[in-house]
Amino acid sequence: VMPWGWNPAIRKRMLKGGVLEKNLPTPDALDKYRMKAARSNALAFRALFYFNKIDYTCGDGCCLVEADGRMTDISPDIVDRYKEGCVFKSLWSGSGKGLCWCRHGFTKNVSDWCSRALKENRGFVMEPIFDKVEDFAMEFYSDGRGKLLFVGYSRFVTDDKGAYRGNILTSDEQVEEWIQQYVPFEAFVRIRNMMQKALETSYATSYMGFLGVDMMVCRQKEGHPYAINPHVEINLRMNMGIVSHVLSDHFIVPGGEGRFSIDCFPTHEALMERHEQDMQSYPLV
């Protein structure tokens, strides 16, 4: 059984629907999964890339703020970086949700958000606002028995608050060509290989299923003009990147591009009307 993601409510619903308990994760396993899915786990990967000084990468200056007020620093210049603004991230949320942007000082709204996060989750992640150019992700699959496989890339779009807005449907070869306008291909492959090895060490025997690592291309004030932040977020579940990768493989002609997004409509009739319009305007063949 492989739902989009696991939580106690999904487990309960499946039991009620007749799925045998032996085919479902135990409550203890779900607790462990929840901890592995927390945003704070990306800090270990940040430290790995930072201390190994992997070329053409960025993303240092992040920390975990815990309920007792302690901060786990990743970079000594964290305070200076935060002068240009920072973003606070809930330990558990998805699709760009659970973010609090602090661009104009520590206002009451920001303070209230932090207080709620500490009360509800005992902590949150704090990081600088990076000068992002574009978003993308690397997708993997863990078999739960020690093997973690690279599935492919995905490119996606977010709004100015970091919320997910859709995917660009394109091939892996096109992504590798696209990324070379920012970093050398050899550096990109090194980043991918190091991430795959680190993920295999962390998850290959304790998690089975798809996982995606959100990354972004950032402008640099010093050194290389552009660098990759390779550990923005680790999505320990099925995700839109996997879906868009499958759609691209099956429905986009070689060398072509498409868009994948989710729209909401007030009625079934409105949805059907839009669907028929799109079928005529953007036929698959």
List the model feature ranges, each with a label:
Residues 11-17, 97-100, 136-137, 222-227, ...:
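A short acidic (Asp/Glu
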Residues 1-76, 93-94:
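Conserved N-proximal alpha/beta basic substrate-recognition cap immediately N-terminal to
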Residues 73-84, 117, 203, 215-227:
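A short acidic-Thr-Gly-centered motif at the start of a beta-strand
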Residues 164-226, 265-284:
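A long amphipathic alpha-helix within ATP-dependent nucleotide-binding catalytic cores
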Residues 64-65, 79-101, 119-132, 213, ...:
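ATP-grasp fold ATP-binding core
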